[in-house]
From Swiss-Prot:
This is RNA polymerase-associated protein RapA. ATP binds at D176, E177, V178, G179, L180, G181, K182, T183. The keyword Iron does not apply. The gene is rapA. It is an enzyme of class 3 (hydrolase). Its EC number is 3.6.4.-. A motif (DEAH box) lies at residues 278-281. The keyword Nucleotide-binding applies. It comes from Shewanella halifaxensis (strain HAW-EB4). Residues 491-678 form the Helicase C-terminal domain. Keywords: Activator, ATP-binding, DNA-binding, Helicase, Hydrolase, Nucleotide-binding, Transcription, Transcription regulation.
Length: 968
């Protein structure tokens, strides 16, 4: 290499040293000083890993005094370069010797890095291109936000998330029956809103007992890192911000925290995008006296654009309570309870028409007339004719029915704000089997009852009944708090025998009181050494989590988990299928809540319900009322609260007095009323709302699309190559699992999301669902997203040189492959990525500037290429400079033409989708007042914004590869 003092060179292996200056040439050695770092390097003149830095006309360069020059002419004098051009600030014609160039110069543009000899390995160029394709594929996916969560692909859950998650500032009521997965639906919506940029700041309000469970669920299932806020956390946060809620984007807190005026004011001022309220049916409301909890949520809902309320079903709540929730979502729309009742009555015609369509049978003249009247603004005669035509294709007829159902759904009063699935409309639940185990009443309890009756005459009936349902509690109170009752209670003997007989089975035991649960654990431990753990409201959240994890362990874990009534709220243990009810709650909803701990979506076995009770006592009579009157053990009973309210007086008297005649009368009356309510509910079932909530065939197709994405071999290959390039150690763990560890040779100093001690991952959804300790990898997982960002935001793979061995082409033939990114700068919330995400534009030029990319695919071209030593690659680039410079300008012309096409297609797609949706919503607003003005104005504003962003779309060269033909 010809070296001269003062020349500027850059190190091919240590580009971070900046621009070097030749300060010594002696014999076969050359000394280069790198002024930016003050370091010297000594190189062999013949094999120095150095590249001469020479700029070209049009380049902008910077002097060591930090003024810039646009180069117009390059002069070589005495082996040194002098640049002539225009001063960027003054416009004067100036000259700059290369010795006076800025030392801190870095080559960021791919073409600059190529000519400066900063050439990457061939595999890195390939991985970079695959990363850009993956990012584009994810951004344009219709399933964005649904693929990543570690949840089962259950149709109604995915459907609700798909429908609600795509809305701007959704305000909906999720009112599925117990066990159908409202928390998962909310998590899916949150995940989708965050990933699509529709929301950034989210507040989740839950009962105090569920805060940690939500925290764990959001992280384990959705990879979302929420922060739990309590008073202590708020005080700590003052060091960072006057408003503690601004210190985190994703926050979970309890209503109790917000009861303090100061904290509520801070929450109101925190600019949330979405609020989620769990157990919203506990928010008590009446027109005269709404509760404090209701007022807190109401104040927040007036400030926060998006609101999700998770609540019990309207059937369980009663109409006024249901109206109160809807009022939180849209107070202008749901302003008067009587008007709401009247409006609901008018939906019966819509529901009747929907029943006719959903039945799949031929439509009667009455049904056709009803449909025609309801959909009077459009001509449906062709669709009706098609449905009635038995000779028509089955799929075509089904499509016609579906379209008419969709039209009816759009006109349904609460169809856009209420989602309610019931077990009647969702399949896949296990059988529930009741096993009763009557036990003889011990004498100790008989005595305790007698004494209690004499001493507690002042108590009201309700309090007396609660006492007689828990004889162990009465005995403890009279025995100075001693817990010795378990030594003679026959229910405990039965429980021990049951656990010994079923040692291999996990058993959940629920009792009303925490004291009872603790005593039972002591009994099992001291009498038989049975491994059991307790779960009650006196334990901290972390203690409860540990107890739950101990119970869940297959090997070495507890056989039994003993829960108190309050302690078990919100916890699910569907890996167990045996439930022991040590006593019974005096409330049908609480009974269902107990059974619902096991009877949930995901339960793979029948739920066996065991009920040991004391014969000829209030326990037996309550068992009979629940079983014979309500059928509440083996089926869900939505009318349970109604029946309890209607018969509570008679029930309480019957429980206190052992009167067989009264009991028979009560059972007969309850059973008759139960059948009456069941029939009324069946007839009044809102089939249209059910169709909208579970999605029908559309939900099944959605789930099938998601299932097809699972195990995508192309994705798996791309992700594994990505981890290889970054330097992540991958150890096969068997059973479709891989253990990832940071290696000593990581390309980047940190890889966010990859723990130092490693993480076990799988691409198999079923495995991830069966193992809490294994992460599910999809293209939405943070480990994949972070990996893509690390590569695409760095210079990795932006340049490469390769050899094409093909004797059909003349040796020395040159090809220049350029990867541009077509993009437009816009905030994520604008949703521009749906129409013009960063899109790779490939241009492949021969030496004459002909674009061959349409005829030669990337894959076929790449397979024929071989890597080149970096030193040789640098020489090849230098030798080809004269040919390459004009090709860059030519390539940009081709890429710009493609950009215009992409922008036009994006604009057409955006206009078609959004204007179509806008017109549809405007038309529907005339027949369905649930269409909010905010949705219409947001769509109009979004279209204007997107057009502006598309006007500013641009190209950026992302990577370049020089390819030379060789016959060697």
């Amino acid at each position: 290499m010809p070296f001269s003092l003062g020349q500027r060179w850059i190190s091919d292996t240590e580009s971070e040293l900046g621009l070097g200056t030749v300060v010594g040439v002696e014999g076969r050695m050359v000394t280069v000083l790198f002024p930016a770092t003050g370091e010297n390097r000594l190189f062999s003149r013949t094999e120095a890993p150095l590249t001469r830095v020479i700029y070209n006309p049009g380049d902008t360069i910077e002097s060591h005094e930090e003024w810039s020059l646009v180069v117009t002419e390059v002069e070589e004098k005495d082996s040194l370069i002098i640049y002539h051009g225009t001063h960027s600030e003054t416009g004067e014609q100036v000259s700059l010797r290369e010795t006076l160039l800025n030392h801190n110069i870095r080559f960021n543009k791919p073409q600059d890095r190529l000519f400066a000899g900063q050439i990457d390995r061939l595999d890195r160029f390939n991985v970079r291109y695959q990363c850009q394709l993956l990012r584009n594929k994810l951004a344009t996916s219709d399933l964005l936000g649904l693929q990543g969560p570690r949840v089962g692909l259950i149709p109604h859950q995915q459907w609700i998330a798909h429908e609600v998650g795509q809305r701007f500032a959704p305000r909906v009521l999720l009112a599925d029956e117990v066990g159908l997965g409202k928390t998962i639906e909310a998590g899916l919506i949150i995940h989708q809103q965050l990933l699509t940029g529709r929301a950034e700041r989210i507040l989740v309000i839950v009962p105090d007992t569920l805060r940690h469970q939500w925290l764990v669920e959001m992280l384990r299932r959705f990879n979302l890192r929420f922060s739990v806020f309590d008073e202590d956390r708020c005080v700590e946060a003052y060091a960072d911000n006057d408003n503690p809620f601004y210190t985190e984007q994703l926050v979970i807190c309890s209503l109790d925290l917000l009861r303090k005026k100061r904290r509520l004011d801070q929450a109101l001022d925190a600019d949330w995008d979405l609020m989620v309220v769990d157990e919203a049916h506990h928010l008590e409301w009446s027109e005269e006296a709404p509760s404090r909890a209701y007022q807190i949520v109401e104040a927040l809902s007036e400030e926060i654009p998006g609101v999700l309320l998770l609540t019990a079903t309207p059937d369980q709540l009663g109409h006024q309570s249901h109206f109160a929730r809807l009022r939180l979502l849209d107070p202008d729309r749901f302003y008067d309870y009587q008007a709401f009742l009247k409006e609901e009555d008018s939906y019966k015609d819509v529901a009747t028409a929907a029943d006719a369509l959903a039945s799949g049978e031929s439509l009667s003249d009455e049904s056709i007339a009803g449909l025609t009247q309801l959909l009077s603004e459009k001509d449906i005669s062709a669709s009706i004719a098609l449905i009635q035509d038995d000779s028509a294709d089955t799929d075509t007829r089904l499509q016609a029915r579906d379209e008419l159902l969709q039209d009816l759904l759009d006109r349904h009063g609460t169809g856009r704000v209420l989602y309610r699935n019931s077990r009647a409309s969702v399949k896949g639940f296990p059988q529930r089997n009741l096993h009763v185990h009557p036990q003889k009443m011990p004498e100790q309890y008989v005595t305790a009852y007698r004494v209690s009756a004499m001493m507690n005459k002042h108590l009201d009936t309700n309090a007396k009944v609660r006492q007689v349902l828990s004889p162990e509690k009465i005995y403890q109170d009279f025995d100075s708090g001693s817990a010795s009752w378990w030594k003679f209670d026959p229910r405990v003997d039965w429980l021990i025998d049951f656990l010994k007989t079923n040692r291999s089975k996990k058993v959940l035991i629920i009792a009303s009181q925490a004291e009872t649960a603790l005593s039972l654990e002591e009994a099992l431990r001291t009498r038989e050494g049975i491994q059991a753990t307790v779960f009650h409201e006196g334990m901290s959240i972390i203690e409860r989590d540990k107890a739950g994890a101990y119970f869940a362990q297959e090997t070495g874990g507890a056989q039994a988990l003993i829960c108190s009534e309050i302690g078990s709220e919100g916890r699910n243990f569907q890996f167990a299928s045996n439930l022991v009810l040590f006593d019974l709650p005096l409330n049908p909803d609480l009974l269902e809540q107990r059974i619902g701990r096991l009877d949930r979506i995901g339960q793979k076995n029948d739920v066996e319900i065991h009920l040991p009770y004391l014969a000829n006592t209030a326990q037996e009579r309550l068992t009979e009322w629940y079983h014979q009157g309500l059928n509440a053990f083996e089926c869900t009973c939505p009318s349970g609260h109604i029946l309890f309210n209607e018969f509570s007086g008679e029930l309480l008297e019957t429980l206190l007095n052992n009167d067989e005649t009264s009991l028979e009368t009560l059972l007969d009356n309850t059973k008759a009323r139960y059948q009456e309510l069941k029939l009324a509910m069946e007839q009044g079932r809102d089939k249209l709302l059910e169709i909208n909530s579970h999605g029908g065939e559309r939900a099944n197709k959605l789930v099938q699309s998601l299932a097809d994405k699972d195990g995508d071999t192309q994705l798996i290959g791309s992700v594994i190559r990505l981890w290889d390039i970054i330097g992540v150690e991958q150890e096969d763990s068997g059973e479709n699992a891989i253990v990832l560890h940071p290696s000593e040779h990581m390309m980047f100093p940190t890889y966010p999301g990859l723990p130092e001690d490693g993480i076990t991952v799988t691409f198999d959804r079923e495995m991830a669902l069966s193992r809490d300790d294994i992460a599910l990898i999809t293209q939405e997982h943070p480990l994949v997203q972070t990996g893509l960002d690390l590569i695409t935001s760095s210079e990795t793979g932006t340049t490469s040189v390769a050899v094409l061995k093909n004797k059909a082409l003349p040796a020395g033939t040159i090809f220049l492959e350029l990867i541009y990114l077509a993009d437009a700068s816009a905030p994520k919330s604008s949703q521009l990525y749906r129409y013009l995400p960063p899109t790779p534009v490939r241009v492949l030029l021969d030496k004459n500037g002909n674009n061959l990319s349409d005829n030669v695919t990337y894959e076929s071209f790449n397979k024929q290429l071989s890597a080149v030593n970096r030193h040789i690659a640098s020489k090849l680039v230098n030798a080809s400079q004269a040919i390459l410079h004009p090709l860059f300008a030519k390539a940009e012309t081709f890429a710009n033409a493609e950009l215009q096409t992409l922008t036009a297609c994006a604009r057409e797609k955006m206009t078609s989708q959004l204007s179509g949706e806008l017109e549809r919503l405007k038309a529907l607003k005339a027949v369905n007042p649930n269409i909010r003005d905010e949705e219409l104005s947001h769509l109009s504003e979004q279209m204007s914004e997107l057009n502006r962003y598309l006007d500013s779309s641009k190209l950026q060269l992302d990577a370049v590869r020089l390819v030379l033909v060789s016959h060697a």
